[in-house]
Regions:
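A sequence-composition feature that detects small, non-aromatic residues
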Residues: 28, 35-36, 51, 56-58, ...
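Alpha-helical structural elements
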Residues: 9, 25-28, 69, 84, ...
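Long, charge-rich boundary regions
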Residues: 43-118
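C-terminal, charged low-complexity interaction regions
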Residues: 109-182
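N-terminal cysteine/histidine-rich coordination modules
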Residues: 1-70
């Protein structure tokens, strides 16, 4: 699996939940989920994820690309693939849509909350994979709780990520680079 360069992941966009590659802008993204019935015949919605809207990933040669294949999902458990363009979840109207989904419990609560953070909170997506290491190294101590970070904490993590040494960088090079970049 190709790893996204650190500077690219910090800049902007979202990581595709299917292929792991960059979804560079709102128009390139799609949010989808699966609707089916549970064993008692009650509606069950699951599998909320942010993926590439069109087949842009070399890892997914199928026509559906990173998106769920509706035929496969129906065969598995008579599931129906539902979704909306990523831009529907952005901005004030997108926040209202996400809040309505939370209020109506249309989708699993934790999945909707995580999507809201990814789309609505500046820097959250870029900092997400870095936060665990940043907390363990004392870069931040979350004021609210794990998974819920203030903007100052997110920006501290992103600044730290730009200056932290890689396995190939000596401590002296790291210190010099950080001094220059401030």
């Amino acid at each position: 699996m190709r790893v996204m360069p650190r500077d690219k992941s910090i800049r902007s966009g979202w990581r595709c939940d299917s292929c792991g590659q960059l979804v560079p802008d709102l128009q390139a993204g799609w949010v989808e989920w699966l609707a089916a019935e549970d064993t008692r015949g009650k509606p069950k919605v699951s599998g909320l994820r942010l993926v590439h809207h069109r087949n842009t990933s070399a890892r997914s040669p199928e026509s559906y690309g990173c998106r769920y294949n509706p035929r496969d999902e129906f065969r598995k458990n008579r599931g129906i693939v539902e979704g909306l363009a990523l831009d529907r979840f952005a901005g004030p109207d997108g926040l209202m849509l996400l809040l309505s989904m939370i209020a109506e419990r249309e989708l699993p609560l934790q999945e909707v909350i995580e999507l809201a953070k990814r789309v609505q909170i500046p820097g959250y997506e870029a900092a997400y994979e870095l936060v665990h290491d940043a907390v363990s190294q004392g870069v931040i101590a979350p004021c609210i709780s794990s998974g819920f970070y203030l903007q100052c904490e997110i920006w501290d993590v992103l600044k730290w990520a730009k200056c932290r040494p890689s396995a190939k960088t000596s401590q002296v090079e790291h210190q010099n680079r950080c001094v220059v970049s401030h």
